[in-house]
C-alpha cells in the first residue's frame, strides 16, 4: 500500500495526501522549485527574499492577519529556502487544517509584494546576512560551496549579497514568481488527520490556473573543484571544512555515502568522533555529512578547533580518512545501517517529518522513496561498495578545504594536500 495518495492536476500541480485517523493534528506544506540554484548574479537571494515577502501580506490577509490567525490555531507557520526549493509549512489541529492551508495558499499564490514592505524587508534580510557572516561555522559552510563550485549555481549563497538584496524591486519578484511558482513546479502535502474533500477543493481553487511555464528547469552537472582556501577572520575557534565530490541525488550510491558519513562522523561511536574528541581531546565537535543535490553531491568533514590543536586535528582527520577504506568492517557497517534506519523509523512517527520527506522527494525526484524501498537500499549496500566509494574520500589531494579564522595558513594546508610531512 502506498504511503501517500498522489493527485496530479492537468497543469502539473501535485497534491500528496497521507491520512492518519489516529492523529489529532495535520502537518502540511507547499514546496516550490525556487532556490539559489536557479538565480543569476543579479537576482542572487531572490528566492529567499520572496519567502520573506509572502509573510508581509496577501490578497486576503494582512501581515497582522497572518500572524494572529496562525497564533490562534496554535501552529507554527514557517518557511525555509534551500538551494533547490522553497517550502512553506505548518502543523495545526485537524479541525483547523482547511483554514491553515487557505492561509498558506493565499500567501503563496497572491502575495502583495508592496514596495514599502519590500524596502523595510531589505534591512531585515541584510541583518540576517550579517548574522550568518558573524557565525564562523555558517560562514565556512557557505564559503566552502562558493569555492567548491565556483562555476556553478550550486555555489551560490541562499541569502544573496547586500548589493543583490538592495537592488530588488517588486517587479523583479513578480517575474521570478511567474517563472518558478508555476503549478508544474509546486507540490502540496498533507500528513495526519484532515478532511480529504475540503483539501482537494481548496487546492483546486488556488492551484488550478493554467500552467504558464514548464516544470523545474534542468541544471547542468556541477564540476567540483579541489583546492585550499583560507579566509582570515578574528575568531575564538577556527572552522574547517574538508569536502569531496560525492554522489548526486539521482544516484543510488548516495545511500552508501550516507552510511560512510555515519561511520566516520555521524555518531558518538564514529571514527572521527572517537579519535579526535574521545582519544585526543582535540575538538568539541566533529561531523561528517553527505549532501546530495540534483547536479552534484558533497561528502564533507567539518570541525571547530583552536589554532593550537588545528594542525594535529587536521592531520588526524586526514589519517582517519586514509585508513578507512582498507579497515572498515562489516560490524561497523551493520551498526551504521541500524543507526540510520532506527533514526528514520523514529522520525517517521512525526507527521511533519513525513510531510517534509514526501514533499521534497516529489518535487525533486518525482516521487519520495518508500520506507520499505529505502530500507532495502540501505540493507543492500555492501562492504565492497563502501570501500570503493570511501577511496574517493581518502586523499586530501582530491578535497576542497575551506578554513576560516586565525588558521595555520595556506602553507600548512598545501603541504597536507601534497602528502608531505
Q: What residue spans do the PLM features occupy?
A:
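A signal for specific C-terminal beta-sheet/loop modules enriched in small/flexible residues
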Residues: 28-34, 48, 104, 218, ...
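Active/ligand-binding-proximal structured segments within catalytic/core domains
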Residues: 12, 19-70, 144, 252-264, ...
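Short hydrophobic beta-strand segments that form the core of ligand-binding sensory/regulatory domains
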Residues: 27-29, 87, 241, 300
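A generic secondary-structure signal marking the coil-to-beta-strand transition
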Residues: 5, 13, 24-28, 227, ...
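Charge-rich, well-structured scaffold segments of protease-associated domains
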Residues: 3, 8, 19, 63-214, ...
Amino acid at each position: 500500500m502506498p504511503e501517500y495518495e498522489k493527485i496530479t492536476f492537468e497543469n502539473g500541480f501535485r497534491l500528496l495526501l497521507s491520512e492518519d485517523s489516529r492523529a489529532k493534528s495535520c502537518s502540511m506544506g507547499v514546496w516550490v522549485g525556487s532556490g539559489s540554484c536557479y538565480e543569476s548574479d543579479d537576482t542572487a537571494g531572490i528566492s529567499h527574499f520572496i519567502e520573506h515577502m509572502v509573510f508581509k501580506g496577501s490578497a486576503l490577509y494582512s501581515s497582522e492577519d497572518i500572524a494572529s490567525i496562525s497564533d490562534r490555531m496554535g501552529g507554527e507557520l514557517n518557511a525555509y529556502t534551500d538551494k533547490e526549493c522553497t517550502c512553506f509549512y505548518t502543523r495545526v489541529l485537524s479541525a483547523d487544517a482547511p483554514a491553515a492551508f487557505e492561509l498558506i495558499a493565499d500567501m503563496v499564490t497572491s502575495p502583495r509584494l508592496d514596495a514599502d514592505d519590500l524596502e523595510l524587508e531589505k534591512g531585515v534580510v541584510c541583518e540576517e546576512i550579517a548574522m550568518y557572516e558573524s557565525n564562523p561555522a555558517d560562514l565556512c559552510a557557505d564559503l566552502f560551496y562558493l569555492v567548491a563550485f565556483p562555476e556553478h549555481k550550486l555555489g551560490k549563497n541562499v541569502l544573496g549579497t547586500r548589493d543583490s538584496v538592495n537592488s530588488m524591486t517588486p517587479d523583479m519578484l513578480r517575474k521570478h514568481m511567474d517563472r518558478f511558482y508555476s503549478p508544474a513546479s509546486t507540490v502540496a502535502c498533507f500528513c495526519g488527520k484532515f478532511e480529504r474533500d475540503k483539501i482537494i477543493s481548496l487546492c483546486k481553487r488556488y492551484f488550478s490556473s493554467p500552467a504558464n511555464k514548464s516544470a523545474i528547469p534542468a541544471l547542468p552537472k556541477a564540476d567540483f573543484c579541489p583546492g585550499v582556501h583560507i579566509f582570515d577572520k578574528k575568531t575564538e575557534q577556527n572552522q574547517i571544512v574538508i569536502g569531496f565530490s560525492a554522489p548526486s541525488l539521482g544516484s543510488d550510491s548516495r545511500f552508501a555515502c550516507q552510511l560512510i558519513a555515519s561511520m566516520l562522523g555521524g555518531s558518538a561511536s564514529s571514527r572521527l568522533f572517537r579519535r579526535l574528541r574521545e582519544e585526543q581531546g582535540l575538538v568539541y565537535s566533529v561531523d561528517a555529512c553527505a549532501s546530495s543535490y540534483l547536479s552534484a553531491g558533497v561528502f564533507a568533514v567539518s570541525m571547530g578547533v583552536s589554532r593550537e590543536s588545528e594542525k594535529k586535528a587536521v592531520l588526524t582527520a586526514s589519517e582517519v580518512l586514509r585508513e578507512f577504506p582498507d579497515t572498515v568492517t562489516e560490524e561497523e557497517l551493520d551498526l551504521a545501517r541500524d543507526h540510520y534506519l532506527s533514526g528514520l523509523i523514529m522520525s517517521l512517527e512525526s507527521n511533519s517529518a513525513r510531510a517534509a520527506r514526501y514533499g521534497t522527494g516529489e518535487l525533486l525526484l518525482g516521487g519520495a522513496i518508500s520506507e520499505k524501498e529505502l530500507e532495502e537500499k540501505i540493507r543492500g549496500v555492501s562492504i565492497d561498495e563502501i570501500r570503493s566509494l570511501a577511496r574517493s574520500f581518502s586523499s586530501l589531494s582530491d578535497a576542497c578545504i575551506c578554513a576560516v579564522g586565525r588558521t595555520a595558513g595556506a602553507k600548512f594546508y598545501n603541504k597536507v594536500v601534497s602528502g608531505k610531512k
